[in-house]
Each structure stands twice: as C-alpha cells, then as structure tokens.
C-alpha cells in the first residue's frame, strides 16, 4: 500500500473516531441534563472537571457545537454550560480539541508529541478567536481549553490536558447562537423506527445467548447419562454461562462507550 493510501486510510479512521465521539458526548450530556443519575459517564467526569455532577444536572442552559468554523481554526467541539449554584451563576465554555490514537499502548511517541504541540497551538488560536467574536455583553464566561487524546477502538480517554482558564465578558446567548450557526456537524437523531430496530437486535442477541446456554446444558446432561451407563459416577457439571455473559457485557460496553 502506498504512503498516500495509508495517509488517506488514517484520515478516514480519525474522522470516524471524531464523529463517534461527538455522538457519545452529546448523548451523555443529554442524559445528564434529563436528570438520569446513572447516566453520568466517567468520560464526562474527566472532561468536565471544573464542574460537578450536580452542576451539570442543574444547568439552565447547555449548548454544544461540533466542527465550529471560526475561520483560521475549526475546533472539534465547543460546549457552553450555564449553571446556578447557591444563587450565583456560573458559565463555562469548553473548547475540546480531539486527537485520535490508533495505537494507545504508549502515549509518549513522536507522533503523539507532534499531535500534542499541534493541539496546543490550535487551542490557543481558538481561545483568541472566540474572544474576538464574542458579542459585547456583561456575562462572565470562563473559557476552558481541553486537549483530549482518545483511542480509536473503544473511545477510551487516554489523556486530558487542560490549559489555564481564561475569563471573558460578553453576551452569552448571542455567543452560543453564533457558534451553533457556524457549526458544520450535527449528530444524527435516531428515529423511533431505528430505536425499535436496535432494541429488537438486542433482544435477538440475548435469545441466541440463552439458546446457546440451553444447548450447553443439554450436552452436559447427555454426557452424564453416557457416563452413568458405563458405570462411571461423575458429578453433573452445570453449563458455563460465559458466552451469555460475554455477549451481555459487550452490549453494555456498546452503550457505555458509544
């Protein structure tokens, strides 16, 4: 395979990883916003470190924009969360620059170091651009740049680097509206038909696992009867549910990791 094809393949894999991460992050934010206590994914705990779980649940406004076109820079994600804590308002604007890693065993490689330096430059430029484009106003906004390394397989967070926050003042509502208007990617909304299809698929997988477990049980009974006929007294071994458990764990992993 030529070098150009390898680069094109790596680009496609990275792009696919980005869109998957966007979908998962938006889903997790939406679940927390709806008040599902168990939906606070550990992925959010790392990303939203300046805020607490309660802060996110009590958010009065959450705005998420992906692939935001700011001219010279296009940050992967800009998330604005406005909360009310003990009567005092708090607004945090997260700028997420995502770097996908095909091989996640070692985070300290020349390639990842190059990605790190590039990401830092992108974040600094993005902070300056957001400060320039923020409409005039009295709202206090804490801009928090985040450089996130994520594995292409599993979407596991490998490293999150947070630059020092920068406080700016402006019109929060107009800023959020502007960022949404210049966003170039919107996570797809699954239709009711698609959700039902996924639900049926999960039920089908579970039924196959149960049939496999029953088959193992019947095989164990047959083996016991053969041993008994030969005069061999062996205890009946219960069928292993490892296959069923593995499938269920895989399903859980699909929903927890996107």
Curated annotation (Swiss-Prot):
Pfam entry (one): Herpes_UL24
Protein name: Protein UL24 homolog
UniProt function note: May participate in nuclear egress of viral particles. Plays a role in the dispersal of several host nucleolar proteins including NCL/nucleolin and NPM1. Since deletion of host NCL/nucleolin negatively impact on nuclear egress, UL24 supposedly acts on this process through its effect on host nucleoli.
Annotated localization: Virion; Host cytoplasm; Host nucleus, Host nucleolus; Host Golgi apparatus
Gene Ontology CC terms: host cell Golgi apparatus; host cell nucleolus; virion component
Family: Belongs to the herpesviridae UL24 family.
Biological source species: Varicella-zoster virus (strain Oka vaccine)
InterPro entries, sorted: Herpes_UL24
Induction trigger: Expressed late in the infection cycle.
Keywords: Host cytoplasm, Host Golgi apparatus, Host nucleus, Late protein, Virion
């Amino acid at each position: 395979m030529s070098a150009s094809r390898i680069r094109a393949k790596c680009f496609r894999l990275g792009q696919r990883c980005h869109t998957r991460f966007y979908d998962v992050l938006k889903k997790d934010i939406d679940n927390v916003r709806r008040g599902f206590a168990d939906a606070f994914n550990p992925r959010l705990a790392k990303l939203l470190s300046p805020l607490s779980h309660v802060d996110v649940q009590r958010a009065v406004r959450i705005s998420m924009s992906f692939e935001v076109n700011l001219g010279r820079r296009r940050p992967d994600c800009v998330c604005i969360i406005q909360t009310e804590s003990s009567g005092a308002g708090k607004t945090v604007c997260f700028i997420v620059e995502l770097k996908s890693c095909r091989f996640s065993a070692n985070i300290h490689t020349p390639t990842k170091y190059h990605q790190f330096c590039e990401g830092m430059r992108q974040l600094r430029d993005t902070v300056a651009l957001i400060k320039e484009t923020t409409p005039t106003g009295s709202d206090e906004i804490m801009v928090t740049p985040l450089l996130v390394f994520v594995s292409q397989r599993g979407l596991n967070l490998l490293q999150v680097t947070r630059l020092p926050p920068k406080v700016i003042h402006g019109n929060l509502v107009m800023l959020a509206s502007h960022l949404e208007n210049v966003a170039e990617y919107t996570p797809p909304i699954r239709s009711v038909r698609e959700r039902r299809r996924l639900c049926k698929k999960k039920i089908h997988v579970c039924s196959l696992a149960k049939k496999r477990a029953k088959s193992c049980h019947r095989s164990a009974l047959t083996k016991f009867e053969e041993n008994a006929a030969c005069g061999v007294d062996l205890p009946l071994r219960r069928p292993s549910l490892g296959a069923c458990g593995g499938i269920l764990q895989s399903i859980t992993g699909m929903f927890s990791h996107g």
